[in-house]
Amino acid sequence: MLPNHPPLVVAEQFGTLETLYPGRIDLGLGRAPGTDMRTLQALRRDPQDAERFPSDVVELQGLLSDTSPLAGIEAIPGKGTNVPLYILGSSLFGAQLAAALGLPYAFASHFAPQALTEAVALYRREFRPSEVLAEPYVIAGVGAIADEDAERANTGWRRFLTFNFVCGFVVTMLLIWLWVLVP
């Protein structure tokens, strides 16, 4: 949710964590605001901040390195900590950005399981090696239902599928209704 926070503030916060716990901190960067408009306003952020996500990632990467991209501005602490960055996503946009920047990519397939294969293939195909990563590195978050009893696990899975089908149907019908009836 990088659009909710200025890169300098994130660099200082994660620089502090890295200073306290060296080698134990990773930073996942997502583009989605993850909030409603009122909360976004309370954070003093603009809905268009998500459009600056790629440049904010590059700026943050620079603030955590030894060379700040902003003349006369340094993240203290943060400068030189080189906290590992991961691009988080559930669409092809995140895969393309992670590939272009040579960063690891974590795909939220529990949000968009149908896009997992295409996003990972795109990331691997377009990956450009960088100073931080020589080869593509993918993490996939997946939804799973587990139980010691197979029948209870299967029941949980069927409930999950039914819930998602009903929710998807309702959202689709609402969108069709809005598209057809609202000018």
Regions found by a protein language model. Give the residues of each.
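A conserved active-site cap/scaffold subdomain adjacent to cofactor or substrate pockets
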Residues: F93-A95, A99-F111, A119-V120
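Hydrophobic faces of well-ordered beta-strands that scaffold small-molecule active sites
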Residues: I25-L29, V83-L88, Y105-A108, P136-V142
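An alpha-helical appendage that flanks or caps ligand/catalytic pockets
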Residues: P47-A75, A115-P183
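Short aromatic-enriched loop/helix-cap "lid" or pocket-rim segments at secondary-structure transitions
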Residues: R38-A42, A99, E151
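Active-site beta-loop-alpha junctions enriched in small/polar residues
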Residues: M1-L2, G30-G34, S90, H110, ...
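Core active-site phosphate/anionic-ligand binding loop and the adjoining beta-turn-alpha structural block
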Residues: S68-A71, V83-S91
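Acidic (Asp/Glu)-rich catalytic clusters
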Residues: F14, E18-R24, L97-A100, R124-E135
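Flexible, glycine-rich active-site loops centered on histidine and acidic residues
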Residues: P3-S65, Y105, P113
